[in-house]
């Protein structure tokens, strides 16, 4: 007998933008989604700012989006937690951060502050770095080196020079700190096991084995003139730098885990085999948040706050079979983040990881692995064993981040083809498909200045129900999706899940 599965399809980076200028979603030929949107109950829901536990006006992101969707409630994010701790002063008494400072005092060693130098608020925030500099000054630490990971994805592609200049001014005001290395996030924040990139950052930090610069801002200016934007700055070293040495402290101030794991493991994991480490300094390493539950030899400054009864746990306790499926670049989002930031695999939960294509940037293959994901999922649906399926298509986000408009259009069209196949298959089984997104991106590819626009947008995202006649309310948010799914599946909503179903009674 055929199962009647409920499929939650998350089209990463698919926002609603009424302005068609620079809008790859509006420009794409998407007959399936156009038909689905026209013929089925639909609403638009909040995926940014206060709706997802971020500061008002702050763009959402994939980690935040999937956490809120899986939790079925507004989850207050690490950006807010850390910023509040700075404001109330508790940041400066944080035990892990104090330990890092005390280690430097005890060993007369250097403090290295490493992270994404940006106000994007997706992986880090530069105000958190400034607070660490102030703390170092208060502790009387003299040797403080900043390793500047440049953004160009969550903010403008050439905003990095301004962030460097602001940092230099802050260090002058506070009275401590020198820029040691500068590197694009393409190298330092890989999450796809492309360790040749990470190695360049590691060698720059530990051996100063990289091109040298006298003035960071001037180096950035030259990079722009050479056509190299922030994200792709090849790791380089200041004339004032000292390498990371035995006894030094490192505080990695990114609060989002996924792109901080590889470089952290290179420093702390004795079994790390991503590349041969010429030097392995024994350091006192602080992660701003928990990057991995089993990360060895680190302290965590802001430990995770547990999310009780996320959607996956509800399914498991109801005795249902569930499947999580995505390509590699979004696999953590439908598993770790969807499960409330925990590595737990629930009873009855299966996971399928499809490799992402091995290309330098995803505009070179805008379909990514969407067709492989879809082919695999079609076969799994036809096995008739799953009650609930959580799926992510990465294309609109990952290709959107490249800033290449024509490629983003192709990405949308690939997702359209795949969603059309899956909706028809689920319908043939008598099942229900819910279509949504975690945040916007491909809905704005060109900025007001006419240059490529690579960050996420703050636009609302679609929520569509196919195969379950109903009326949907307005004013919802991502945290309302799980309660809606539970209502459709006739499952009780746990009291911990404070979101409200989008279905009008």
Q: What kind of feature is each model-predicted range?
A:
Residues 1-505:
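Feature captures the catalytic ectodomains and active-site-proximal regions of enzymes
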